[in-house]
């Protein structure tokens, strides 16, 4: 044997032992045996070493073990003896070190211990038929043990568990199967044949995203029949062609959620707004459309508000547009900028690449008026020129070659305040009702012979007539300070007829009274610039509530937030005998939707500020590039 091997423990030899065990009746209960003391014999040594005392909990009726089985169990006991003996002299064998004896956590009854030598013969069913004081698992009456027992135990606890699983499964099925099936609206791009005659003839081919219960008529079912007709500025009878009463509670105007309206998610950088327009700021409540301006930090801006547009969904050309509104805040303090206005559909509000070269052009001539800065060095115009004049070169990018196109603006109102007298402590509310035009008259001065103010005690012409980006004709009308904050509503709107010269006009009104009017001749031919038009373009509709120092300096301490502008309804009327009137974004001779679809990089990117930045080239024209048209 090599050196060092003698120190290793020797493998014991297996010996046959008496299979019959003796019981000490004085030490243990009558139903269990006593401690077992067995000697181990090893080859090469006559000495004996006692094995540790191990309690053998045997019942008297156990079948004696065969010698082979007993020898195997004794070998196992011998192997266990190499570790420190864990026992208690009080015969409560715990199987734990003595340092833990006496702990409440580790106390167990003596019948819970099994010697390894009895695993092959003891009936283990007593484990779950005996009650354990601190463990429900060993309580036969517990619902936990009933799963292992021979007889089922179905009590109220188990019944409640099963009932809960049933309800949970039913709820999941209703949520993910039944509810989607009930709310599915069917074909989201139905053919026009499925709509009524008005919808089939006048709605565009715009494809809408998923929406809940789309309308199949342009007239809201909640509009009273008494509002189906109205007398126009020209004395003719007009018919209702579109209405939205905003009576359905909790409408959402996120992209794709509504047929006619969409709330934008942009910063309106064109006017240096101090707020971010968020769709979450707009909803319907108590039968009104509510646009809420909040004063909190949002996307690196101090305010959050909303802008609702009908761009490329709902447009009008000619007729009367009427809105019932209660303006935000109070007429006593300046600072807020409520707006209800219309814009040519070729420009998407807030997307500056789309307004580049089209706002606020209402022009169909081929002269100096279409050139950058109107070819003038006096700073009268900073506009880049008309992008879509009537004289673009052959095969250039144009929605309707031969027709001058643009995006003029007509405002139903822009809210502000002013003092009736210089020494007044508080302001009073006013609205500006205006039209924006390009190219410009000399020093932006219109021909006042073609303007009319109907009551100069409450309405006067605005001294602001324009700047390098627009020519503005505006009338200022005094309001009642109760028409704010949802306390009372008032009607605002305009009646207009597209055209040049005396063929076109715009008349604004507040309540039942017209405030002021202009004929197209007010912006007729003037020097090097030809006649501008009362808009021939399909006009989209915009509601917004903003705050900007471009409009009015605000004193934060005088304003109250949140400020809410409420819209009760919007209604559009048109003369049934006027063939030039149209509801929709593609009137004859003035299409827009196809052109918009062909230029997605501009119309879907609010961060592009010029047409070239969006990746498109400026169309050439015969005046500047000497080409064929």
Swiss-Prot record:
Keyword Membrane appears in the UniProt entry? yes
**Its topology with respect to the membrane?**
Single-pass type II membrane protein
Record's keyword terms, sorted: Cell wall biogenesis/degradation, Endoplasmic reticulum, Glycoprotein, Membrane, Signal-anchor, Transmembrane, Transmembrane helix
Cross-referenced Gene3D superfamilies, in alphabetical order? 2.60.120.200
Q: What does this chain do?
A: Required for synthesis of the major beta-glucans of the yeast cell wall.
Source organism phylogeny: Eukaryota, Fungi, Dikarya, Ascomycota, Taphrinomycotina
- Origin, by domain of life? Eukaryota
Where does the sequence pass through the membrane? Answer: 162-182
GO molecular function terms attached to this record: glucosidase activity
Basic and acidic residues compositional bias: what residue ranges?
1-13
Glycan-carrying positions: 286, 373, 455, 480, 513, 607
Q: List the stretches on the Cytoplasmic face of the membrane.
A: 1-161
Q: Does the keyword Transmembrane helix apply?
A: yes
Origin organism is Schizosaccharomyces pombe (strain 972 / ATCC 24843)
Q: Where does this chain mainly localize? A: endoplasmic reticulum
- Its protein name is Uncharacterized beta-glucan synthesis-associated protein C23H3.11c
**GH16 domain mapped to chain residues:** 231-578
């Amino acid at each position: 044997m090599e050196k060092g091997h003698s120190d290793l423990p020797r493998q014991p030899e297996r010996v046959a032992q008496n299979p019959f065990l003796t019981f000490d009746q004085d030490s243990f209960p009558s139903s269990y045996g006593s401690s077992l003391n067995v000697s181990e014999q090893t080859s090469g040594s006559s000495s004996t070493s006692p094995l540790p005392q191990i309690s053998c909990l045997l019942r008297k009726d156990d079948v004696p073990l065969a010698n082979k089985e007993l020898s195997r169990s004794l070998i196992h006991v011998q192997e266990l003896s190499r570790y420190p003996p864990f026992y208690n002299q009080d015969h409560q064998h715990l199987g734990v070190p003595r340092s833990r004896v006496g702990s409440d956590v580790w106390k167990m009854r003596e019948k819970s211990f099994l010697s390894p030598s009895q695993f092959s013969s003891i009936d283990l069913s007593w484990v779950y038929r005996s009650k354990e004081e601190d463990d429900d698992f060993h309580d036969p009456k517990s619902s936990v043990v009933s799963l292992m027992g021979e007889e089922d135990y179905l009590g109220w606890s188990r019944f409640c568990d099963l009932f809960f699983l049933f309800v949970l499964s039913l709820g999941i099925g209703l949520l993910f199967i039944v509810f989607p099936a009930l709310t599915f609206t069917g074909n989201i791009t139905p053919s026009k044949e499925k709509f009524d005659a008005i919808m089939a003839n006048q709605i565009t081919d715009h494809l809408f995203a998923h929406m809940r219960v789309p309308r199949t008529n342009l007239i809201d079912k909640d509009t009273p029949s008494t509002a189906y007709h109205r007398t126009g500025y020209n004395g003719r009878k007009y018919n209702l062609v579109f209405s939205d009463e905003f009576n359905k509670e909790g409408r959402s105007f996120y992209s794709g959620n509504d047929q006619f309206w969409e709330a934008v998610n942009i910063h309106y950088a064109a006017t240096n707004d101090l707020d971010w327009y968020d769709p979450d700021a707009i909803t319907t409540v108590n039968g009104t459309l509510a646009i809420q301006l909040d004063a909190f930090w949002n996307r690196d801006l101090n305010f959050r508000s909303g802008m609702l547009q009908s761009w490329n969904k709902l447009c009008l050309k000619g007729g009367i547009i009427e809105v019932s509104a209660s303006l935000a805040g109070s007429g006593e303090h300046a600072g807020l900028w409520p707006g209800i206005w219309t814009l040519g559909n070729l420009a998407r509000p807030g997307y500056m690449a789309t307004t580049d070269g089209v706002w606020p052009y209402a022009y169909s001539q081929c002269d100096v008026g279409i050139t950058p800065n109107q070819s003038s060095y006096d700073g009268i115009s900073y506009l880049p020129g008309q992008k879509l004049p009537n004289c673009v070169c052959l095969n250039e990018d144009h929605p309707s070659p031969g027709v001058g196109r643009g995006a003029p603006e007509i405002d139903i109102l822009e809210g502000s305040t002013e003092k009736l007298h210089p020494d007044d402590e508080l302001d009073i509310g006013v609205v500006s009702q205006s039209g924006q035009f390009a190219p410009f008259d000399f020093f932006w001065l219109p021909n006042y012979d073609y303007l009319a103010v109907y009551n100069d005690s409450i309405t006067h012409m605005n001294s602001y007539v324009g700047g390098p980006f627009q020519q503005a004709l505006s009338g200022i009308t005094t309001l009642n300070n109760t028409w704010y904050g949802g306390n009372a509503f008032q009607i605002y709107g305009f009646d207009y007829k597209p055209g040049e010269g005396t063929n076109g006009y715009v008349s604004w009104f507040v309540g039942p009274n017209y405030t002021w009017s202009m004929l197209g001749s007010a912006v007729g031919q003037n020097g090097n610039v030809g006649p501008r038009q009362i808009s021939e373009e399909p006009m989209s509709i915009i509601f917004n509530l903003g705050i900007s120092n471009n409009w009015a300096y605000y004193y934060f301490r005088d304003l109250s937030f949140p400020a809410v502008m409420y819209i009760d309804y919007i209604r559009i009327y048109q003369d049934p005998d006027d063939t030039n009137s149209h509801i929709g974004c593609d009137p004859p001779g003035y299409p827009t939707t196809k052109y918009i679809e062909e230029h997605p990089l501009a119309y879907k990117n609010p961060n592009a500020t010029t047409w070239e930045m969006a990746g498109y080239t400026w169309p050439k024209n015969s005046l500047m590039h000497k080409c064929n048209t």
